[in-house]
């Protein structure tokens, strides 16, 4: 009997070891992976072969991972180096002949970490770090390399730039996940854009940039410093020399990769011939002269297909005139869009080179009241050879953005093996391992953007959507709903509450919790409201129903308070959560159950939820999908970040739900030039219109309404020409009844 127990114990241990060896999961997934059903222990004593010649950043990582003692004569042999080094010369044929490729082998005799170049060796170490678990390594042979040349992040969003500490954390995260590019281009950095792009950084900011460059180098990331001069650049020698001087100052700070952005501008800065001449001058007089410049990238003015003039030659001019080594960025068919084969073929044909993709996800600078924590999907997985780079534009919430960044790292390294859901789950487990299930629950219901000017949406709450739809349909029709669907919703709300509490108390990743806290509070209130609404549906008796009704109204008030006091940015202020499936389900169920109660008891309970009573109508393409917002007695159109092309005769109109005394209208088109092209009108019936005079101070337009009755407000381009403006502000203030 004793021998049988020993045999069973040994069999279990062998099974565990075999399972560990077989279930090797790596992110990003390698191009070629062979796993043996064996493991080895991390050596207690080892000989390091090639440590003095190999990439020092890789050697540093290796020594941090090894807990054993280094010896010159005994112990397991660990060979590390780059192709051509003596230490790994016999493995030259095994090393993939690709930039940043590597060969990794683990067996009982030797560990080999061999890169095609220094960065390849560093990436071999990142894979080695993932293989090492609890002091054990599976026997493997890996041949790996990236499918896309440049992979990373562009900090190119509008709003609050990342903090210095957040950027340092990001750069380390990129290195671990085999991303080689960080493009520094925050829209609100005054020394990146007009008018201060000509000026040097103050000492404090310069020192921080210098530290970022150093940390980027340690983690094998190209720090790409971008300049955004197009809004006020003069096409003359003086400005050209000032730009080159700024690049030289950044070079002295350690920067070795550069970008010039011409996005979201209007005026003479949009001239493609002049842009090409400037970039070529930078390339020939700066980038090619320096022996160590890595990347030179430009973002064009027409950076997506929908903004490209079909009758113009902007993109073809860049394709013909720009030096071949200069990369050209592209966001896809629209500002916010996924990358398709047809789309990338269209742009590559015009720019005569593979596009450098600027993917605008999970950026939320046009839906700042939402968190975008869902999976990365929608991009073609067969077009790696058609693009030179793939960088993601993140949220202003740096830590929260890592969920998508992790997934983009996996996609860009090996699109053919990219697994949307597995990568998303791995990302969450990497970012918050101690509460991965709770973060997954929160992220599952915080992935959609809500209605927005770009019309870009994401799936959300997919696991309960069928049950929610079936239940709501049956309940609204007065039919018996499926008990299993009802219980699914009950469990979902219970799990949401639990997850919220656990996340709020988590201390493992404090920066993440600080970022998401307002949304987590709102998430919990949403779940509590859902539970109470379901209890109203069960409707035991009149007094019980009224108790739950009063509680729901109190929860609505708490949610309104959070929405009005947290995340009060000037564009899309507030906190929205679970907006695609769960919140509409709760609101519609509440409205229906209150209607049934009122009919049964001849009552007049208010069934109002947070709906939008007013409407906005426009035939201006970039405005027509922008959501309306209500803040106290103000009705405002959500601002747009990009240049709005307002055709002659087109208009924007706000229709209120009733006639109100009007107080004033505030408009800002981001232009100091006199707004002689526009006409502002008000109406009570949408038929008879009264023109309202506008006063202008710099770019701000205002009109006092002196409590004139108003239900409709309309602004029209009455000129004969298209106007290019920025919709910074459009606010109607009324006197509430």
Swiss-Prot record:
Family matches, as SUPFAM superfamilies: (Trans)glycosidases, beta-N-acetylhexosaminidase-like domain, Hyaluronidase post-catalytic domain-like
Entry's Gene Ontology molecular function annotations: [protein]-3-O-(N-acetyl-D-glucosaminyl)-L-serine/L-threonine O-N-acetyl-alpha-D-glucosaminase activity; beta-N-acetylglucosaminidase activity; identical protein binding
Activity vs pH: Optimum pH is 6.0.
Residue numbers binding a protein: 156, 187, 263, 303, 358-360, 365, 393
Catalytic activity: 3-O-(N-acetyl-beta-D-glucosaminyl)-L-seryl-[protein] + H2O = N-acetyl-D-glucosamine + L-seryl-[protein]; 3-O-(N-acetyl-beta-D-glucosaminyl)-L-threonyl-[protein] + H2O = L-threonyl-[protein] + N-acetyl-D-glucosamine
Keywords: Glycosidase, Hydrolase, Signal
Regulation acting on activity, per entry: Inhibited by 1,2-dideoxy-2'-methyl-alpha-D-glucopyranoso-[2,1-d]-delta 2'-thiazoline (NAG-thiazoline) and O-(2-acetamido-2-deoxy-D-glucopyranosylidene)amino-N-phenyl-carbamate (PUGNAc). Not inhibited by Streptozotocin.
Signal peptide span: 1-21
Active site per the UniProt annotation: 264 (proton donor)
Segments for region (Catalytic domain): 148-433
GH84 domain sequence ranges: 149-416
Additional note from the record: Metal-binding observed in X-ray crystal structures is artifactual.
Quaternary context: Homodimer.
Function (record text): Can hydrolyze the glycosidic link of O-GlcNAcylated proteins. Can use p-nitrophenyl-beta-GlcNAc and 4-methylumbelliferone-GlcNAc as substrates (in vitro).
Family: Belongs to the glycosyl hydrolase 84 family.
Full protein name: O-GlcNAcase BT_4395
Organism: Bacteroides thetaiotaomicron (strain ATCC 29148 / DSM 2079 / JCM 5827 / CCUG 10774 / NCTC 10582 / VPI-5482 / E50)
Higher taxonomy: Bacteria, Pseudomonadati, Bacteroidota, Bacteroidia, Bacteroidales
């Amino acid at each position: 009997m004793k021998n049988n127990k020993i045999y069973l114990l040994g069999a279990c241990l062998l099974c565990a070891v075999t399972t560990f060896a077989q279930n090797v999961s790596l992110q990003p997934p390698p191009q070629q992976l062979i796993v043996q059903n064996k493991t080895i222990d991390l050596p207690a004593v080892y000989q390091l072969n090639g440590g003095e010649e190999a990439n020092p950043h890789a050697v540093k990582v290796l020594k941090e991972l090894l807990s054993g003692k280094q010896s010159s004569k005994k112990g397991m042999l660990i060979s590390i180096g780059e192709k051509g080094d003596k230490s790994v010369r016999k493995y030259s044929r095994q090393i993939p002949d690709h930039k940043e490729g590597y060969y990794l082998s683990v067996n009982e005799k030797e560990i080999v970490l061999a890169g095609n170049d220094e960065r390849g060796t560093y990436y071999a170490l990142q894979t080695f770090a993932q293989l090492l678990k609890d002091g054990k390594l599976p026997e493997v042979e890996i041949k790996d390399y990236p499918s896309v040349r440049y992979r990373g992040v562009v900090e190119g969003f509008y709003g609050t730039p990342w903090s210095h500490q957040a950027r340092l954390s990001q750069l380390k995260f990129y290195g671990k996940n085999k991303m080689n590019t960080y493009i520094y281009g925050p829209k609100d950095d005054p020394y990146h854009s007009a008018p201060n792009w000509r000026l040097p950084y103050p000492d404090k900011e310069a020192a921080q940039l210098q530290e970022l460059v150093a940390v980027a180098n340690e983690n094998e990331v190209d720090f790409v410093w971008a300049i955004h001069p197009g809004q006020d650049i003069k096409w003359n020698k003086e400005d050209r020399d000032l730009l080159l001087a700024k690049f030289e100052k950044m070079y002295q700070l350690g920067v070795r990769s550069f970008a010039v952005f011409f996005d979201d501008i209007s005026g003479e800065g949009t001239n493609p011939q002049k842009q090409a001449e400037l970039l070529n001058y930078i390339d020939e007089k700066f980038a090619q002269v320096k022996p160590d410049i890595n990347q030179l990238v430009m973002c064009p003015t027409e950076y997506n297909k929908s903004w490209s003039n079909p009758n113009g030659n902007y993109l073809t001019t860049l394709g013909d005139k720009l030096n071949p080594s200069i990369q050209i960025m592209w966001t896809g068919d629209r500002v916010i869009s996924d990358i398709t084969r047809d789309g990338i073929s269209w742009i590559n044909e015009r720019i005569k080179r593979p596009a450098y993709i600027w993917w605008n996800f999970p950026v939320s600078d046009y839906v700042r009241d939402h968190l975008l924590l869902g999976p990365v999907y929608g991009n073609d997985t067969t077009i790696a050879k058609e693009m030179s780079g793939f960088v993601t534009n993140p949220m202003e919430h740096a830590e929260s953005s890592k969920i998508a960044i992790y997934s983009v790292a996996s996609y860009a390294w090996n699109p053919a093996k990219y697994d949307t859901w597995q990568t998303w789950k791995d990302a969450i487990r990497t970012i918050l391992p101690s509460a991965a299930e709770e973060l997954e629950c929160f992220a599952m219901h915080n992935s959609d953007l809500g209605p927005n000017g770009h019309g870009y949406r994401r799936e959300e709450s997919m696991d309960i959507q069928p049950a929610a739809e079936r239940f709501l349909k049956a309940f609204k029709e007065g039919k018996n709903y499926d008990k299993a669907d009802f219980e699914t919703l009950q469990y979902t709300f219970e799990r949401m509450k639990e997850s919220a509490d656990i996340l709020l108390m988590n201390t493992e990743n404090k920066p993440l919790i600080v970022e998401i806290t307002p949304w987590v509070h709102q998430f919990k209130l949403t779940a509590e409201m859902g539970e109470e609404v379901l209890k109203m549906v069960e409707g035991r008796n009149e007094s019980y129903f009224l108790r739950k009704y009063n509680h729901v109204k109190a929860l609505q008030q708490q949610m309104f308070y959070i929405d009005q006091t947290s995340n009060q940015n000037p564009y899309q202020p507030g906190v929205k959560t679970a907006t695609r499936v769960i919140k509409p389900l709760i609101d519609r169920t509440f409205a229906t159950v209150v209607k049934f109660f009122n009919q049964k008891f001849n009552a007049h309970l208010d069934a109002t939820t947070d709906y939008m009573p007013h409407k906005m109508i426009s035939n201006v393409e970039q405005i027509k999908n922008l959501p309306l917002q209500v803040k106290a007695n103000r009705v405002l159109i959500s601002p747009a970040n990009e240049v709005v092309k307002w055709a002659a005769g087109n208009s924007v109109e706000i229709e209120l739900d009733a006639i109100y005394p009007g107080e004033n209208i505030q408009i800002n088109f981001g232009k100091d030039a006199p707004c002689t092209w526009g006409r502002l009108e008000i109406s009570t019936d949408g038929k008879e219109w009264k023109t309202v005079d506008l006063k202008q101070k710099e770019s701000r337009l205002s009109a006092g309404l002196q409590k004139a009755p108003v239900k409709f407000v309309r602004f029209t381009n009455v000129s004969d020409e298209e106007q290019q403006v920025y919709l910074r502000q459009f606010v109607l203030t009324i006197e509430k009844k």
